[in-house]
């Protein structure tokens, strides 16, 4: 596994958003986040801190309409930056999972840096489709964020809400669980130094 910090830096500009992301997978949880959506900033901060990633996100988008494009496009760019940073995956554990409690809520994330993008989510209460946190973050965007992240990071990601009631707690537990699962998966495998696949490539 490389001794140099694994850093990904991606920019993406469309008619709907301008997103710039830099992530250091070998960081210490230093974050600089500004998306124009305060609750989303809070979630990305938690993602960086609990993943122990150094994370910089600067996003501007059409938030005067809603937060959808900014959140989804940030997930696209973050996923691409993670894929760039992890490189050929040599020496990583590849798999990671984490169960995270937050008061009445328990969420779980399972990840495989397989190179085969796939996303599954289950268990969020139906009312999260209609919930809005902080006046500008509809929790229906949780699924959009994690799906876009998985597809662009080229990982298999399962996000499961085992139980919970508060939309804030459920959302935050999901973000933190995903961060911790990714942190485990990209960590060094002390016993295997090559690419963690019988195919010899991921």
From Swiss-Prot:
E.C. code: 4.2.1.19
Chief place where the protein resides: cytoplasm
Annotated pathway: Amino-acid biosynthesis; L-histidine biosynthesis; L-histidine from 5-phospho-alpha-D-ribose 1-diphosphate: step 6/9
Keyword set includes Ribosomal protein: no
Short name of one Pfam family: IGPD
Family: Belongs to the imidazoleglycerol-phosphate dehydratase family.
Identification of the protein by name: Imidazoleglycerol-phosphate dehydratase
Organism (species): Corynebacterium diphtheriae (strain ATCC 700971 / NCTC 13129 / Biotype gravis)
